[in-house]
């Protein structure tokens, strides 16, 4: 009984503190997604890879980690200034060629991290379960460079975590949990980010609604 009460209490907190999700049309317009860490050691690589595989079934997907090089000049185009014409042209061409582009950064603060946020329609902020919520350089970057893109928190692992504290520190609207290697988790995340998720409505009033949850 105690576990059940705690589960319901957690569920209610998440519902009450979560703003309504964007309409499906808004989410279906998402083409560029930044995957960023909110603390050192966050599993950014695993999340970006899993999300890219899931999105690939919906359209051509590119994942860029900041090491893109000009084959002719040998320059790291992604590391140039955000105002550099060659860099802007390179990323614009990618976004034209691919249905989805994932911008990945492993650093909390850098020119490339800021560019990832500037390019993104949606930001996926990655935290590891079990890590206490903390303000980091990425928290500041999100405030400066997200340019109105919605931020959604992804917690990796099943350990105890306070998602609401992480969300408050980083301005995230929603949070999701995924496990490394769990393909179904990333397919669900891809559906939610792109507005292709299917919801379930419970009817019959409060008591009956909770009864439906019990059946699930």
Where are these regions (language model features)?
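Intrinsically disordered or compositionally simple regulatory linkers and C-terminal tails
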Residues: 11-27
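Walker A (P-loop) phosphate-binding motif
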Residues: 22-69, 198-206
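Alpha-helical scaffold segments in soluble metabolic enzymes
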Residues: 7, 50, 54, 188, ...
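Flexible, glycine-rich phosphate/dinucleotide-binding loops
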Residues: 41-42, 70, 132, 160
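Cyclic-nucleotide recognition modules
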Residues: 1-8
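Patatin-like phospholipase
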Residues: 31, 76-82, 88-100, 105-216
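Structured core of small recognition/catalytic domains
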Residues: 46-102
């Amino acid at each position: 009984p105690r576990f059940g009460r705690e589960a319901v209490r957690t569920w209610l907190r998440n519902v009450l503190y979560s703003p309504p999700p964007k309409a499906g049309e808004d989410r279906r317009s998402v083409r560029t997604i930044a995957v960023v860490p909110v603390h050192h050691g966050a599993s950014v690589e695993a999340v970006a890879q899993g999300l890219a595989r899931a999105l690939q079934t919906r359209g051509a997907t590119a994942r860029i980690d900041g090491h893109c090089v000009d084959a002719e000049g040998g320059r790291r185009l992604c590391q140039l200034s955000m105002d550099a014409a060659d860099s802007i042209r390179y990323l614009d061409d990618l976004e034209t060629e691919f249905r989805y582009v994932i911008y990945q950064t492993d650093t909390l603060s850098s020119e490339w991290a800021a560019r990832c946020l500037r390019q993104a329609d949606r930001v996926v902020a990655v935290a590891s379960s079990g890590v206490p919520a903390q303000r980091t350089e990425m928290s500041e970057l999100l405030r400066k460079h997200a340019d109105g893109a919605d931020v959604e928190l992804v917690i990796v692992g099943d350990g105890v975590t306070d998602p609401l504290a992480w969300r408050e520190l980083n301005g995230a609207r929603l949070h999701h949990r995924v496990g490394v290697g769990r393909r179904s988790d990333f397919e669900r995340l891809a559906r939610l980010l792109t507005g292709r998720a299917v919801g379930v409505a419970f009817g019959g009033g409060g008591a009956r609604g909770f009864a439906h949850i019990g059946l699930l």
